[in-house]
Amino acid sequence: MQKIRKGDKVVVLAGKDKGRTGEVIQVMPKEDRAVVRGVNVIKRHQRQTQTQEAGIISKEASLHLSNLAIVDKDGKPTRVGFKVVEGKKVRVAKTSGEVIDG
């Protein structure tokens, strides 16, 4: 089970976008990376093809999972733990102890 999943609201802990928050669009568990909406935006030069025009495209690049933390109910970054509730393994916020709904 992953600590950060698609749809989670996260805050960036390190790097050029430190302190910014966003929603996780994609998680790549094999690379330990995630793509966050509106964070770590890069510009790529697109060559013209038969279907696409040439130009500069902005898109989100991936961030390492160690640089992300889930945002708790009160808006502060929290670490994630696991607990078994009613026979199911669930994610729990370390700061408040609340179950993180997935």
From Swiss-Prot:
GO cellular component: a single term: ribosome
One BP term from GO: translation
Molecular function via GO: rRNA binding; structural constituent of ribosome
UniProt xrefs under InterPro entries: KOW, Rib_uL2_dom2, Ribosomal_uL24, Ribosomal_uL24_CS, Ribosomal_uL24_KOW, Translation_prot_SH3-like_sf
Pfam family, one: ribosomal_L24
PROSITE patterns: RIBOSOMAL_L24
Keyword terms: Ribonucleoprotein, Ribosomal protein, RNA-binding, rRNA-binding
Assembly notes: Part of the 50S ribosomal subunit.
Protein task: One of two assembly initiator proteins, it binds directly to the 5'-end of the 23S rRNA, where it nucleates assembly of the 50S subunit.
NCBIfam families linked: rplX_bact (TIGR01079)
Protein family: Belongs to the universal ribosomal protein uL24 family.
Protein's UniProt name: Large ribosomal subunit protein uL24
